[in-house]
């Protein structure tokens, strides 16, 4: 026959199963058993034609076929012999095919199984037989119709009851993965339940049975939103509608076209259903005019102020409506940036603090994120809550920090309001520890300034300072204390309680590590810089206390200062020159710092201007532990316990531009690889406009010129110099400065311990000064790489810029950076820095190396023979 390309034997078997011809199917499936039967019939006269007529071409084909036909052969649509037999209700043939091993759950190309075919035509006995052989009772076809739905559509009550007793899901939507094995590509099959199919075709008995088994009367199709009650209204089945309402069907349910079952019955002119549903329905049909009028959300999208006003005036509740995304009209107006609409909605009592149901954003957050500054101002004036958090934990202030180029005024505005709110609520009794500090003593937390209007005034002055700085000459260093301060004339608050340690002797050196995490910078002038840094950190934590932000540092709130196009090192320092117009090599080589004089000893001693020291070229003496010994300061020096005279070296003291000075002893201390040190000394109050000095020297104090006040002998005690090959994360003990008794009987000041959180490493004999510039350069690099989350690791391990440029992949793994991609980014940045600035850094390091070599030789010659090095 060859029809459709199927072998003739296949076609014969499928036709036999469709017709219920068990004998032909047996001959085709068991040719060995059929031949003897035919031979036994030959001797009978006249039987052969009858046999041939009965068997027909099937017998001839069976004799021609030498091998048996596969029991699971199928036609072009994938229908098997078992499916044909089940659809026809031929129970003996179905039983025979199952004994021959036919697959009970095989599907055709449309996802239909043999059980579906039996249920479709209501063959209870065949369905029972298939279920006994393991047929899937919850199978679905490619359209999403289940076996129960197929049976309910046909109104076959017996099959429906059999399927329910066999465990069929009454609403068939419980298993989530049923249609995965059907070969279909539709993500959303028709969501028609058995109850809906029975109602649509008017099978009340099946509806009653399904309702008794717990069918959901309010299950609506996702695509059109139709409920079973709407289908009953469509078909005009009053009895079915009454059953549904008795079981809890909602008559006010709306379809996607916003129609109720009452409107469906009205449209279909089913008067009995209209009369029945009318008193039950509270959602009344809209007039044609109402249907043509756009809702308030559409009016807002069009920007039609007059239409929004009319809608709000007609029904004030519309201003707080919620759309499908959980958003209110005020949120939509805040996104579009239309201030007039925002004002109108707020005047109509729109809830300014309402959060959407999807992300938890408020109108203030939307306006902030989209940069609508005027709307932010207006909402804040209307009392919008800045402390509300979205579902991801962000506040409005946090969102503005995430913008690539946030508006400075917007940042100031939100920050000031956040601080004011926290000030009104009262600051917490204890502050959380900063990420970079593992150990923080209670006395090490600076007090927030309360002068000139409190935090808000302080933030305004700080923001004004941002505006005065030039963009091209500013590194991303946060509030580096070597910049001129516009409010430096303020008296510095005494921080004795926070910055002074108790008097110590030589044996108290073991207590230094506990004090090390107090501040990042040392020197008595660094107290102001530390106070600013901690103040800003505290302010950000109070204003936006979200710890999941990329960083809690101030750098996140300096939007005008964009990072440079490439990694620039020392660019700020190279641009500075001396007053006489001549470039100062020491300024070029070393990051700039500022120092504040602290006269001690004689109470009325005035500090003299401190100027850079010009050193003669002296031969270098071998480096030894003697260089770390005790120094007897020159009798020409005066000015307190830590005053060091340098005039005998031939150095001339000159005043530096901008009030920023480099103290040479800080470089000596840095080369000795002293561990983190903080010079804690009683700060003196002076009105000289000199910025705070975040230095790394234990002796960063000004020296008076020769001929000053009477000399005061002091004893400088330092620990033994560590080997030059110390790692970048050295934890060596900090050197200690212990003043000896004054010859004039003056009470000695409290001993000062030197400890800095910047543990400096030395490369090629040079050193990097422990200024805040190094840290903020490193911070800027991490920010540009979007790796701010690793900043606490570098701060905890005290990796400065010099050490950062020498890190390897193994070092990064030891630091705790486990992600390969992050390590590759950091290594690429290090390579770029070293490649682009290699020559310049080499010159810098050679300059520092020569400077230290010269000064070490000079310093070692100035020691008095009576002093022996410390043990």
Curated annotation (Swiss-Prot):
All copies of the SAM domain together span 773-836
Q: Where primarily located? A: other
Q: Does the keyword Phosphoprotein apply?
A: yes
Q: Where are the ANK repeats?
A: 8-37, 77-106, 110-139, 143-172, 190-219, 224-253, 257-289, 291-321, 325-354, 359-388, 392-423
Asked if Cytoplasm is a keyword of the record, the answer is yes
Tell me where it resides.
Cell projection, Cilium; Cytoplasm
* One of the Pfam families matching this protein, by short name: SAM_1
Instruction: Describe the PTM.
Output: Hydroxylated at Asn-138, most probably by HIF1AN. This hydroxylation results in decreased NEK8-binding.
Q: Where is it found, in Gene Ontology cellular component terms?
A: ciliary inversin compartment; cytoplasm
- PROSITE patterns in the record, alphabetically? ANK_REP_REGION, ANK_REPEAT, SAM_DOMAIN
**What segments bear the compositional bias annotation Low complexity?**
43-54, 627-647, 687-699, 721-739, 750-770
Marked site, Essential for ANKS3 interaction, at 823
Positions of the UniProt region annotated as Disordered: 28-54, 424-445, 477-532, 565-659, 672-775
The family database entries (SMART domains) matched by this protein are listed as:
ANK, SAM
What keywords would UniProt list here? ANK repeat, Cell projection, Ciliopathy, Cilium, Cytoplasm, Disease variant, Hydroxylation, Joubert syndrome, Nephronophthisis, Phosphoprotein, Repeat
Gene Ontology process terms (BP): determination of left/right symmetry; heart development; in utero embryonic development; kidney development
Record-listed Phosphoserine modification sites: 657, 734, 742
Enumerate composition-biased segments (Basic and acidic residues): 571-585
Summarize the impact of residue 798 to K.
Answer: Loss of interaction with ANKS3
Q: Which illness does the annotation name?
A: Nephronophthisis 16: A form of nephronophthisis, a chronic tubulo-interstitial nephritis that progresses to end-stage renal failure. Some patients have cystic kidneys of normal size and no extrarenal manifestations, whereas others have enlarged renal size and severe extrarenal defects, including hypertrophic obstructive cardiomyopathy, aortic stenosis, pulmonary stenosis, patent ductus arteriosus, situs inversus, and periportal liver fibrosis.
Question: How the protein assembles, per its UniProt entry?
Answer: Homooligomer. Interacts with NEK8. Central component of a complex containing at least ANKS6, INVS, NEK8 and NPHP3. ANKS6 may organize complex assembly by linking INVS and NPHP3 to NEK8 and INVS may target the complex to the proximal ciliary axoneme. Interacts (via SAM domain) with BICC1 (via KH domains) in an RNA-dependent manner. Interacts (via SAM domain) with ANKS3 (via SAM domain).
Q: Domain comment text? A: The ankyrin repeats are necessary and sufficient for NEK8-binding. The SAM domain mediates interaction with the SAM domain of ANKS3.
Role this protein plays: Required for renal function.
Q: What is this protein called?
A: Ankyrin repeat and SAM domain-containing protein 6
Q: What organism does the UniProt record list as the source?
A: Homo sapiens (Human)
Lineage of the native species?
Eukaryota, Metazoa, Chordata, Craniata, Vertebrata
Gene behind this protein: ANKS6
């Amino acid at each position: 026959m060859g029809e459709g390309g199927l072998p003739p034997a296949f076609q014969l078997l499928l036709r036999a199963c469709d017709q219920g011809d068990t004998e032909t199917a047996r001959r085709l499936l068991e040719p060995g058993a059929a031949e003897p039967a035919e031979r036994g019939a030959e001797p009978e006269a006249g039987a052969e034609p009858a046999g041939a007529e009965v068997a027909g071409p099937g017998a001839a084909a069976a004799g021609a076929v030498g091998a048996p036909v596969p029991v699971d052969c199928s036609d072009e649509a994938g229908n098997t012999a078992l499916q044909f037999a089940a659809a026809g209700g031929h129970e003996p043939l179905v039983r025979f095919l199952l004994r021959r091993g036919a697959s009970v759950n095989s599907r055709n190309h449309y996802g239909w199984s043999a059980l579906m075919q039996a249920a479709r035509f209501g063959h209870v006995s065949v369905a029972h037989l298939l279920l006994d052989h393991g047929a899937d009772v919850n199978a679905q076809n490619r359209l999403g119709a289940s076996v129960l739905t197929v049976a309910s559509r046909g109104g076959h009550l017996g099959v429906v009851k059999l399927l329910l007793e066999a465990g069929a899901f009454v609403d068939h939507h419980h298993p989530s993965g049923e249609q995965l094995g059907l070969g279909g590509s539709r993500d959303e099959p028709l969501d028609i339940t058995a109850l809906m199919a029975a109602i649509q075709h008017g099978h009340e008995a099946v509806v009653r049975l399904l309702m008794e088994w717990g069918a959901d009367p309010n299950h609506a199709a996702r695509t059109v939103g139709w409920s079973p009650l709407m289908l009953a209204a469509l078909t005009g089945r009053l009895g079915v509608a009454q059953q549904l309402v008795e079981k809890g069907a909602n008559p006010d349910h709306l379809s996607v076209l916003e129609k109720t079952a009452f409107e469906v019955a009205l449209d279909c002119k089913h008067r009995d259903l209209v009369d029945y549903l009318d008193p039950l329905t509270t959602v009344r049909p809209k007039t044609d005019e109402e249907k043509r009028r756009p809702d308030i959300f559409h009016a807002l999208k069009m920007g039609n102020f007059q239409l929004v006003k009319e809608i709000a005036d007609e029904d004030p509740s519309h201003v707080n409506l919620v759309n499908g995304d959980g958003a209110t009209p005020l949120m939509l107006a805040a996104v579009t940036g239309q201030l007039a609409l925002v004002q109108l909605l707020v005047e109509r009592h729109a809830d300014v603090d309402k959060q959407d149901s999807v992300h938890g954003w408020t109108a203030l957050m939307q306006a902030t994120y989209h940069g609508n500054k005027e709307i932010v101002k207006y909402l804040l004036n209307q009392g919008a809550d800045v402390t509300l958090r979205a579902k991801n934990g962000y506040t409005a202030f946090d969102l503005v920090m995430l913008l690539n180029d946030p508006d400075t005024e917007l940042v100031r505005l939100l920050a000031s309001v956040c601080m004011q709110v926290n000030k009104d609520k009262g600051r917490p009794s204890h502050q959380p520890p900063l990420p970079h500090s593992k150990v923080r003593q209670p006395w090490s937390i600076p007090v927030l300034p309360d002068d000139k209007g409190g935090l808000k005034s302080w933030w305004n002055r700080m923001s004004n300072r941002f505006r005065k700085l030039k963009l091209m000459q500013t590194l991303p260093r946060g509030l580096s204390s070597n910049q001129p301060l516009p409010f430096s004339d303020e008296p510095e608050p005494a921080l004795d309680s926070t910055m002074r340690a108790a008097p110590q002797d030589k044996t108290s050196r073991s207590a230094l590590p506990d004090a090390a995490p107090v501040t990042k910078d040392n020197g008595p002038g660094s107290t102001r810089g530390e106070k600013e840094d901690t103040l800003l950190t505290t302010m950000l934590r109070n204003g936006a206390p979200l710890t999941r932000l990329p960083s809690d540092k101030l750098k996140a709130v300096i939007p005008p200062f964009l990072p440079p196009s490439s990694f620039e090192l020392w660019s700020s320092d190279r641009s500075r020159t001396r007053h006489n117009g001549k470039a100062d090599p020491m300024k070029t080589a070393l990051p700039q710092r500022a120092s504040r004089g602290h006269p001690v000893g004689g109470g009325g001693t005035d500090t003299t201007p401190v100027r850079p020291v010009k050193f003669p070229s002296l031969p270098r003496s071998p480096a030894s532990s003697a260089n770390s010994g005790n120094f007897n300061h020159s009798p020409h020096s005066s000015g307190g316990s830590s005053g060091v005279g340098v005039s005998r070296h031939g150095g001339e003291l000159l005043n530096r531009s901008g009030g920023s000075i480099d103290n040479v002893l800080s470089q000596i201390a840095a080369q000795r690889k002293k561990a983190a040190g903080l010079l804690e000394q009683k700060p003196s109050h002076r009105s000289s406009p000199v910025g705070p000095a975040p230095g790394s020297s234990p002796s960063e104090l000004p020296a008076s010129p020769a001929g000053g006040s009477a000399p005061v002998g002091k004893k400088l005690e330092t620990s033994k110099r560590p080997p030059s090959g110390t790692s970048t994360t050295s934890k060596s003990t900090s050197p200690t400065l212990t003043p000896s008794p004054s010859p004039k009987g003056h009470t000695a000041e409290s001993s000062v311990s030197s400890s800095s959180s910047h543990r400096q490493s030395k490369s090629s004999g040079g050193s990097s000064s422990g200024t805040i510039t190094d840290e903020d350069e490193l911070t800027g690099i991490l920010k540009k790489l979007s790796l701010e989350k690793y900043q606490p690791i570098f701060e905890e391990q005290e990796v400065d810029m010099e050490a950062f440029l020498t890190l390897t992949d193994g070092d990064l793994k030891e630091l705790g950076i486990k992600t390969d991609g992050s390590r590759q980014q950091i290594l690429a940045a290090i390579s770029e820095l070293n490649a682009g600035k290699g020559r310049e850094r080499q010159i810098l390091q050679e300059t520092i190396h020569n400077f230290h070599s010269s000064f070490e030789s000079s310093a070692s010659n100035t020691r008095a023979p009576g002093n022996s090095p410390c043990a």
